[in-house]
Amino acid sequence: MSYNPYAYATSEQNGVNDRFSHTPQQQRPMQIPRNTPVNGQGNANMNANVNGSGGGFPFQDPRGSMAFQLGQSAFSNFIGQDNFNQFQETVNKATANAAGSQQISTYFQVSTRYVINKLKLILVPFLNGTKNWQRIMDSGNFLPPRDDVNSPDMYMPIMGLVTYILIWNTQQGLKGSFNPEDLYYKLSSTLAFVCLDLLILKLGLYLLIDSKIPSFSLVELLCYVGYKFVPLILAQLLTNVTMPFNLNILIKFYLFIAFGVFLLRSVKFNLLSRSGAEDDDIHVSISKSTVKKCNYFLFVYGFIWQNVLMWLMG
């Protein structure tokens, strides 16, 4: 007869088992072994073991591995060596322009409060005074639009362009003369007017301002040029409102004049603030004659040219 060690269980142990068998389901506390590390020590030890495994070899760059070289050679053979070289140049240029793309992304950092204040600044620029138009600098860089209402942005010009085209499309549909080809013509003509406006502003500042003096970037000028869609949209909506003809003309005239004041002060004050007064590397100041020429140019550009351009676009 074989020996059974469980046959000699004591009555005390049987009593304990019976007691637990008649007791409702109880949750026993989980016991953590003494040798088990707590919290992140286990992960740290595990990472240390993983990093230290393999005989202590350091992590190698995957570009120097045999698999990467084989894949690179196979890809170059598949698309051709010339195409592969062109692909590498494109990737290098995209990597080099990463910093520039990050700078462009700052022009889209807007908030609801900024958009409302910017609309007030465009429609009622007289309430902002004549000294509150300069952008705010912090650590040598301008603050993003969400922190400075005087900072230009790309959000409002892009949304203004889309809204302007959609409103024009809706008006054509209400008249019963909608045509998809006209939509393409309107979009292309609007973009052509914007490019022409940008070219005139950039060329005028280039001829008047010394090249040693820092001026606006092309993106910043595009932002200021794109703000014209705010009065254009309101002028479009006025055509569907029943009112006296003289009142309609008066409101449109005010919108165009207000935009001219906004454009004149925004470009003027921020252009003169970049004359090197706070820059140690540039010791060139704008002469009084240059300031007068800039004022004359911005006056003609903001009040005369903008009215003619918006009349053609509207």
Swiss-Prot record:
Residues bearing the modification N-acetylserine: S2
GO biological process, one term: protein transport
UniProt family annotation: Belongs to the YIF1 family.
Function: Required for fusion of ER-derived vesicles with the Golgi during ER-to-Golgi protein transport. May be involved in proper membrane localization of Rab GTPases.
Name of the protein in its database record: Protein transport protein YIF1
Region annotation (Disordered) ranges: 9-32
Species of provenance: Saccharomyces cerevisiae (strain ATCC 204508 / S288c)
Subcellular compartments: Endoplasmic reticulum membrane; Golgi apparatus membrane; Cytoplasmic vesicle, COPII-coated vesicle
UniProt subunit comment: Component of the YIP1-YIF1 complex, composed of at least YIF1, YIP1 and YOS1. The complex interacts with the ER to Golgi SNAREs BOS1 and SEC22. Interacts with the YIP1 family members YIP4 and YIP5, and with the Rab GTPases SEC4, YPT1, YPT6, YPT7, YPT10, YPT11, YPT31, YPT32 and YPT52. Interacts with BTN2 and SNX3.
Membrane topology: Multi-pass membrane protein
Cytoplasmic side: 2-153, 210-217, 265-293
Chief location: endoplasmic reticulum
GO cellular component, one term: endoplasmic reticulum membrane
Gene: YIF1
Residues in the Lumenal compartment per record: 175-188, 239-243, 314
Keywords: Acetylation, Cytoplasmic vesicle, Endoplasmic reticulum, ER-Golgi transport, Golgi apparatus, Membrane, Protein transport, Transmembrane, Transmembrane helix, Transport
Superkingdom of source: Eukaryota
Residue stretches of biased makeup (Polar residues): 10-32
Coiled-coil region(s): none
Transmembrane segments: 154-174, 189-209, 218-238, 244-264, 294-313
Keyword tRNA processing: no
